[in-house]
Amino acid sequence: LSIFILVIAAYTVYLDAQISAKFAGNKWQVPAQIYARPMFLSLKQEISIKEIEEELQLLGYRRVTRADSSGEYQVLRNSIRIQRRKFDFSHGTENLRNIEISFKNARISQIQDLNSRQSINNIYLEPWLVTRLVSSGREDRMLVQINDVPPILTQALVAVEDQNFYQHFGVAPLSILRALMANISAGRTVQGGSTLTQQLVKNLFLTREKSLVRKAKEAMMALIIEVRYSKDVILEAYLNEVFLGQNGDTGVYGFGLASYFYYDRPLNELSIDEIATLVGIIKGPSYYNPRKHPQRALERRNIVLRSMFESNQLSPNEYQDLVTLPIKLASGASLKKGKHPAFMDQVRRELRLVLDNPDIRQSGLKVFTTLDSNAQMKAERAVSEGVAKQEKRIGKSGFEAAMIVT
């Protein structure tokens, strides 16, 4: 017995070292993010409301009748109101800002901070994310911090995946017992009793093999993690690790990236039904893929909403309203690959020269480029219209054209 205890103790120390090393370092590789030049707006600048609106739409802002939340804007007769998002610019972090830009004679006549009621001389919109430099076949994720995650997301996650998350110490014996009885009844492994912590262990450290030995290791590691780290640290790791879809040959991991993949917006701008849809995907990202199987995704979302209602996170009226909503997805254009290939080839070449260490290029680096998205849109529109006119004038189709923006 003493030898057995010594072996278990030694193995526990070994697992603890593995866990500590993983949590102390960079748990994940995060692709470099390539941004265009941010739109700069200043007094007396010659620009139209339409041009600003085009930029806002490119950035995934939503046009509303009253702009009250981050990522929203409203167009008035001679002005535009914008809830400019918080962003880490190259010159430093700028917080959420509620502004109104007024126009006179096709120029900006005033920029006002609506919270302070003070006029300002200029402001940046956050830059457009052109692409993410993901290696072929790799995981992609956009890391989030627990303090930036909407509380309703963690509440929904716990309600659906692990209702006793805040009470247990990494394993839930009753859940394991229920799963064990189901497996014995079926004569094979058909059900798991994993907590969120065990799911995190499985994703970070283990294979998907279903065996008692692996399950025992999973439970031991879950207990160690619970002793070493707070519930918030565990939740944050889970939110960034979980698999939520496939973008071509690249895996979509974590809620931060999934928010853009399915809705083209940051996580803190999603509605409750959209958050419930993402939580529902966890059970089977392929089976509940809302693009390929919208009805399945809808039914699964409503199960999540039901769990939230039963956990007193939603009122009866909120629940009834939310389950009637259809699933509406964005195009996922913000993560579309192959945008501006010639420009991106040049960016990659310069990055290899400046940053020869590939690990640095996979550390979540933000790269701010000179690409002017506003000029690019004008150029593309001019070329498209010009080619169409020439084809109509000559009576032939299939013309090609090129333009250089300097």
PLM features: residue spans?
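C-terminal soluble interaction/assembly domains
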Residues: 399-406
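Juxtamembrane regions of bacterial inner-membrane/periplasmic proteins
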Residues: 1-394, 403
